[in-house]
């Protein structure tokens, strides 16, 4: 039997092949580095999602700049804070107009409840997430925090700042169009109960002949600029309930809500 392995010759490598006479050896091509997405490309993508092309792109850039990204306190006016202030009021005006036209039979109390629900921070955070606005946020070392974690509150602020930027760039009509695109479906949803859960729990306890609920801080975690609180609420004869929040007040509300749900408080 013929040894087939004798006919198999090794494939020459680049080191085995001599360069033709009179030519320099060809150096291997350098490895390509993965290109980072430029700020300009990110802003262009965000413009598309917003549905507004900025004549002054610096307004959009400022709307995404957290104060921690600035080198000195003198540059605070270059952060999104002023635009957030403006956008907050523009949002309130546009949503008020939308509610007035959408619910002609609603009284002032119902309109106020619906307005409060639609302009609250959590709603702005939801809108920001739906538009992937976190992609454009500019944070400094302090703002980024441990693990470059983006605080939820920053997203809500930026959403309002974007509204302010659109208003300055395109006027009321442009800002109103943006708000209507992103708030219309939310406006059509049933309004949530807006009463403070701590008040609801206290009134329920009093009706049962119980003392005022006691709130106790159980734990505080996280860095100084982004703390997380765990609070327990206690009532005699009932199992305590706990809540977590970015402030003691928020954690207390969460704890009260947990007890309200568990006890079936209406």
Curated annotation (Swiss-Prot):
<keyword id="KW-0507">mRNA processing</keyword>
<dbReference type="InterPro" id="IPR011907">
    <property type="entry name" value="RNase_III"/>
</dbReference>
<dbReference type="InterPro" id="IPR036389">
    <property type="entry name" value="RNase_III_sf"/>
</dbReference>
<keyword id="KW-0698">rRNA processing</keyword>
<dbReference type="InterPro" id="IPR000999">
    <property type="entry name" value="RNase_III_dom"/>
</dbReference>
<feature type="active site">
    <location>
        <position position="88"/>
    </location>
</feature>
<comment type="similarity">
    <text>Belongs to the ribonuclease III family.</text>
</comment>
<feature type="domain" description="RNase III">
    <location>
        <begin position="43"/>
        <end position="171"/>
    </location>
</feature>
<dbReference type="GO" id="GO:0019843">
    <property type="term" value="F:rRNA binding"/>
</dbReference>
<keyword id="KW-0460">Magnesium</keyword>
<dbReference type="GO" id="GO:0010468">
    <property type="term" value="P:regulation of gene expression"/>
</dbReference>
<comment type="function">
    <text>Digests double-stranded RNA. Involved in the processing of primary rRNA transcript to yield the immediate precursors to the large and small rRNAs (23S and 16S). Processes some mRNAs, and tRNAs when they are encoded in the rRNA operon. Processes pre-crRNA and tracrRNA of type II CRISPR loci if present in the organism.</text>
</comment>
<keyword id="KW-0699">rRNA-binding</keyword>
<feature type="domain" description="DRBM">
    <location>
        <begin position="196"/>
        <end position="265"/>
    </location>
</feature>
<dbReference type="GO" id="GO:0004525">
    <property type="term" value="F:ribonuclease III activity"/>
</dbReference>
<keyword id="KW-0255">Endonuclease</keyword>
<dbReference type="GO" id="GO:0005737">
    <property type="term" value="C:cytoplasm"/>
</dbReference>
<dbReference type="GO" id="GO:0008033">
    <property type="term" value="P:tRNA processing"/>
</dbReference>
<feature type="binding site">
    <location>
        <position position="84"/>
    </location>
    <ligand>
        <name>Mg(2+)</name>
    </ligand>
</feature>
<keyword id="KW-0963">Cytoplasm</keyword>
<feature type="binding site">
    <location>
        <position position="157"/>
    </location>
    <ligand>
        <name>Mg(2+)</name>
    </ligand>
</feature>
<keyword id="KW-0540">Nuclease</keyword>
<keyword id="KW-0378">Hydrolase</keyword>
<protein>
    <recommendedName>
        <fullName>Ribonuclease 3</fullName>
        <ecNumber>3.1.26.3</ecNumber>
    </recommendedName>
</protein>
<dbReference type="InterPro" id="IPR014720">
    <property type="entry name" value="dsRBD_dom"/>
</dbReference>
<keyword id="KW-0819">tRNA processing</keyword>
<dbReference type="GO" id="GO:0003725">
    <property type="term" value="F:double-stranded RNA binding"/>
</dbReference>
<dbReference type="GO" id="GO:0006397">
    <property type="term" value="P:mRNA processing"/>
</dbReference>
<keyword id="KW-0479">Metal-binding</keyword>
<comment type="subunit">
    <text>Homodimer.</text>
</comment>
<feature type="binding site">
    <location>
        <position position="160"/>
    </location>
    <ligand>
        <name>Mg(2+)</name>
    </ligand>
</feature>
<dbReference type="GO" id="GO:0006364">
    <property type="term" value="P:rRNA processing"/>
</dbReference>
<feature type="active site">
    <location>
        <position position="160"/>
    </location>
</feature>
<keyword id="KW-0694">RNA-binding</keyword>
<feature type="region of interest" description="Disordered">
    <location>
        <begin position="1"/>
        <end position="35"/>
    </location>
</feature>
<dbReference type="Pfam" id="PF14622">
    <property type="entry name" value="Ribonucleas_3_3"/>
</dbReference>
<dbReference type="GO" id="GO:0046872">
    <property type="term" value="F:metal ion binding"/>
</dbReference>
<dbReference type="Pfam" id="PF00035">
    <property type="entry name" value="dsrm"/>
</dbReference>
């Amino acid at each position: 039997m013929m040894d087939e392995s004798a006919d198999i010759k090794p494939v020459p490598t680049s080191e085995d092949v001599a360069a033709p006479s009179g030519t320099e050896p060809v150096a291997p091509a350098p490895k390509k580095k993965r290109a980072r997405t430029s700020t300009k490309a990110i802003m262009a993508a965000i413009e598309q999602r917003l549905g507004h092309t900025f004549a002054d792109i610096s307004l959009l850039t400022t709307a995404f700049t957290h104060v921690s990204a600035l080198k000195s306190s003198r540059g605070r006016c270059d952060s999104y804070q002023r635009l957030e202030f403006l956008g907050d009021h523009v949002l309130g005006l546009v949503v008020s107009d939308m509610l007035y036209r959408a619910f002609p039979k609603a009284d002032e109390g119902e309109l106020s409840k619906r307005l409060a629900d639609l302009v609250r921070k959590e709603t702005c955070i939801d809108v920001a997430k739906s538009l992937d606005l976190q992609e454009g946020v500019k944070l400094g070392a302090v703002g980024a925090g441990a693990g470059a974690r983006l605080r939820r509150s920053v997203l809500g602020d930026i959403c309002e700042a974007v509204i302010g930027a659109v208003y300055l760039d395109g006027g009321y009509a442009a800002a109103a169009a943006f708000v209507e695109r992103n708030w219309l479906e939310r406006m059509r949803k049933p309004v949530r109960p807006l009463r403070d859960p701590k008040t609801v729990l206290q009134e329920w306890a009093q009706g049962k002949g119980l003392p005022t609920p006691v709130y106790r801080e159980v734990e505080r975690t996280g860095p100084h600029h982004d703390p997380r609180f765990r609070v327990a609420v206690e009532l005699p004869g009932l199992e305590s309930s706990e809540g977590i929040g970015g402030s003691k007040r928020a954690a207390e509300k969460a704890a009260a809500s947990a007890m309200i749900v568990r006890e079936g408080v209406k």
